[in-house]
Amino acid sequence: MAISSNLLLCLSLFIFIITKSALAQKCSNYKFSTNRLFESCNDLPVLDSFLHYTYDSSSGNLQIAYRHTKLTPGKWVAWAVNPTSTGMVGAQAIVAYPQSDGTVRAYTSPISSYQTSLLEAELSFNVSQLSATYQNNEMVIYAILNLPLANGGIINTVWQDGSLSGNNPLPHPTSGNNVRSVSTLNLVSGASGSTSTGAGGASKLRKRNIHGILNGVSWGIMMPIGAIIARYLKVSKSADPAWFYLHVFCQSSAYIIGVAGWATGLKLGNESAGIQFTFHRAVGIALFCLATIQVFAMFLRPKPEHKYRVYWNIYHHTVGYSVIILAVVNVFKGLDILSPEKQWRNAYTAIIVVLGIVAVVLEGFTWYVVIKRGKAEASAKTSQRVGNDGRSLYV
């Protein structure tokens, strides 16, 4: 009986492993309605896309079927090989979209700039047997590309989707998964991987993440904390002057880290010609300028008893709070552009909410202390005045 139970358990585990493995290989289980067969397939990492292909090294022919699933109406799709680079410019694309009359149009379009309109033209290599089907929200592009084996059999690939205006493709989104849809494909081994650029093989996505983390931590978290320190710790006489040095340290550190993040953003902008995030960029420049003015204005800070100190305080508080508001807005704008997993936005939102609650509680406590201290000082002054007059309060 025990042997039978163990055998059943082993059989169940075996079936589970086989089933899990089969489910994990999404593209290998797909059956084309045209009964076409391909030797290899890759589950592309973004945009719900899959590439099925067969490569004949003797003829240099690459037979492909590019599938784009979960496609909403009014969308175009494209798959491309870039023989000269790793991005969009220089890509030799195959485009397809459903037309208003119900037919599907498939054609070739070389990409020469980021302002492309996806106009039809011949590619730098021969393409034959080009066709496409669209049903059940899935577009499939079929083609044979003549690609003589080069660079060890590794090719750079790009795939995209975007909206249509009538029968005209509109520019695709320039954030989220639409800027991650690049990969390399080894036609010999079948291996695929992310495309790397820049020194040390750091990808643009990694640089975007570094840019986001540096700016989120500095402008978006440390700056508000520094303001909270200055606003609420100085109410305690025992914290003077420690609160000031802590405030300066926090804000200075935030500024230094923020400048590093800002410089990373400038570098990303230079490496991504044609991709513009105008609002995000403008707010970032405004942040840098205001924060820099704030730093250098510290050298012009009048002494507490100086007659112009009140005006300096008004300026300092106005610029400081403006920086914090712009920083939080721009961090959320950056999250919209980067489109990370939802947990990152939730985490930053939670941090801002907690800081907001802390500020509200401390604001109430500060006013309580200030009012109580004011009453005590007023009472002390009254007692002193009465004492000086030689009269009792009880007379």
Swiss-Prot record:
It comes from the Eukaryota. The chain crosses the membrane at residues 210-230, 242-262, 282-302, 318-338, 351-371. It is a multi-pass membrane protein. CDD domains: Cyt_b561_FRRS1_like, DOMON_CIL1_like. May act as a catecholamine-responsive trans-membrane electron transporter. Residues 176-371 form the Cytochrome b561 domain. InterPro entries: AIR12_DOMON (IPR045265), Cyt_b561/ferric_Rdtase_TM (IPR006593), DOMON_domain (IPR005018), UCP037471 (IPR017214). Its cofactor is heme b. It comes from Arabidopsis thaliana (Mouse-ear cress). GO terms for molecular function: metal ion binding. Its main location: membrane. Binds 2 heme b groups non-covalently. Heme b 1 binds at residues 211, 280. This is Cytochrome b561 and DOMON domain-containing protein At5g47530. Residues 1-24 form the signal peptide. Keywords: Electron transport, Heme, Iron, Membrane, Metal-binding, Signal, Transmembrane, Transmembrane helix, Transport. GO terms for cellular component: membrane. Residues 47-162 form the DOMON domain. Gene3D superfamilies: 1.20.120.1770. Heme b 2 binds at residues 247, 316. Pfam families: Cytochrom_B561, DUF568. Coiled coil: none annotated. It is found in: Membrane. DOMON domain could bind catecholamines and thereby could regulate the cytochrome b561 domain function. DOMON domain could bind one heme b.
